């Protein structure tokens, strides 16, 4: 039985057990129900402050974390990378030491995952991964919450398929989360776009003992046959602009189209963490069509992040 997660960092889902992830998901469900019932502020973190450090820009991450803190009775401070002394040469170590003297938690959205690990190492308060080049755990846990909300809580009974870049940071976190919870994820990507070996190693250590599985199927039509969930993400992330032409060419056969979705179950759902590059990884008819739950998925970011914040910030 989980009693407390206070003071824990939230850098990767691999740091959490099956029971702990379910505890966060159940807390998110409870908080969302109270919000929808009219409780716009649930003061679980009164007087607490969250520093939000952004090396990479964002719409959803900033708004969802900021509103989440305020709805928990706390406050959030936006700190752009260039606005901090980080942009003028101060080390991450010193930044972590100083910022953590002023606030109760730090959320950081960075390019290299190692920066998050260094922040956490030198911070006196919990550090939350708002996105890195390797992982996006808050997004993935939101996705799992949304899948359970729409399709039921037993992931082992669902066929969940990710189409596109197998090295995607959201996919990496989805693999770990779904696997730790005992589910299976199918990845359909071209050769050369497989998951990072570090994630495969973590999956084998943390997910396989819980019954987690993953499978790579190169043919997207074969992969989505009878799928319950079809998920995709952008082909060119921030920092990959130099590879844009090659990536688009390589991944073009993995575009999610109406024809592809017809091979999934009739009640299948389509997911995307957003922002979407319409016409690249997905066509308008899918993201705006009957399969799409992307807007519910985006809304759930706030509720899941409220649970994370409420549970780990002392």
UniProtKB/Swiss-Prot annotation:
Functional pathway: Amino-acid degradation; L-arginine degradation via ADI pathway; carbamoyl phosphate from L-arginine: step 2/2
GO BP terms in the entry: arginine biosynthetic process via ornithine; arginine catabolic process to ornithine; citrulline biosynthetic process
Keyword Aminoacyl-tRNA synthetase part of the UniProt annotation: no
Keyword vocabulary terms for this entry: Arginine metabolism, Cytoplasm, Transferase
Molecular-function annotations in GO: amino acid binding; ornithine carbamoyltransferase activity
Reactions catalysed, as given in the entry: carbamoyl phosphate + L-ornithine = L-citrulline + phosphate + H(+)
Main location: cytoplasm
Origin: domain of life: Archaea
SUPFAM superfamilies membership: Aspartate/ornithine carbamoyltransferase (SSF53671)
Locations listed in the record: Cytoplasm
EC number: 2.1.3.3
Positions of transmembrane segments: none
Residues annotated for carbamoyl phosphate binding in this entry: 58-61, 85, 109, 136-139, 273-274, 301
Entry similarity comment: Belongs to the aspartate/ornithine carbamoyltransferase superfamily. OTCase family.
The protein's role, per its UniProt record: Reversibly catalyzes the transfer of the carbamoyl group from carbamoyl phosphate (CP) to the N(epsilon) atom of ornithine (ORN) to produce L-citrulline.
The protein's name: Ornithine carbamoyltransferase
UniProt source species: Staphylothermus marinus (strain ATCC 43588 / DSM 3639 / JCM 9404 / F1)
